[in-house]
């Protein structure tokens, strides 16, 4: 998606992500990734809503969201090992050593809503999982939230085979901070066209 700004008295456009183009490229290349700056016109002014960041985008054919979560888990482990090795070889560095997670837990959206309600949070099925409510159930470190409601998800996100109200999607969290998100993409043209019309 693009949004306009004025730059030297001319209209220019800043990109968010060429995700839909990358999805098309997977038909030829199977795996497509990009590391690039992204710009977002977020209306919120918090430390959780960055206007600019460096993004790692991955699109891959013939996989589902479980495969993508496993790939992210591998990337996190390799990254932490590399940083810890750097710290060991550079004791004056300002980095802090971090333990490598054995496995990154996966919690379903339904499970977390249930836990939040039991902890006294005012949340209903279909609501976003706000940081204040996540804090009430005491999750920390890395974890995935999976199987979000389909309703608010983009048109290209695949629904669950077992429940059409659920999406094959995830968010990667660290404590109450969202680091990444992803999903299984709809691969059938007719289904994708129908979803676009319904959205």
Name each model-derived stretch.
Residues 183-184, 188-199:
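Active-site pocket scaffolds in enzymes
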Residues 1-61:
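Class II aminoacyl-tRNA synthetase-like tRNA-binding/catalytic domains
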Residues 26, 178-186:
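Conserved phosphate/anionic-ligand binding catalytic regions in large, soluble enzymes, centered on
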Residues 68-72, 188:
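Hydrophobic (often cysteine-bearing) scaffold residues that line and stabilize catalytic clefts
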Residues 1-2, 72-176, 197-199:
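Metal-assisted phosphate- and nucleotidyl-transfer catalytic regions
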Residues 57-68, 176-178:
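A generic structural motif
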């Amino acid at each position: 998606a693009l949004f306009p700004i004025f730059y030297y008295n001319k209209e220019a456009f800043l990109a968010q992500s060429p995700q839909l183009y990358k999805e098309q490229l997977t038909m030829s290349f199977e795996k497509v990734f990009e590391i690039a700056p992204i710009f977002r016109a977020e209306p919120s002014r918090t430390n959780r809503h960055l206007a600019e960041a460096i993004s790692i985008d991955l699109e891959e054919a013939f996989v589902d969201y479980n495969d993508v979560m496993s790939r992210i888990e591998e990337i996190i482990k390799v990254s932490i090992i590399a940083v810890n090795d750097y710290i060991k070889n550079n004791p004056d560095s300002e980095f802090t050593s971090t333990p490598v997670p054995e496995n990154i837990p996966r919690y379903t959206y339904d499970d977390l809503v249930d836990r939040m309600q039991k902890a006294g949070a005012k949340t209903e099925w279909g609501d976003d999982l706000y940081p204040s409510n996540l804090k009430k159930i005491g999750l920390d470190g890395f974890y995935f939230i999976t199987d979000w409601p389909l309703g608010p998800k983009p048109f290209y996100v695949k629904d669950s085979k077992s429940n059409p109200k659920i999406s094959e999607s995830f968010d990667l969290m660290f404590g109450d901070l969202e680091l990444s998100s992803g999903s299984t993409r709809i691969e059938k043209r007719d289904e994708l066209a129908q979803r676009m019309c319904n959205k």
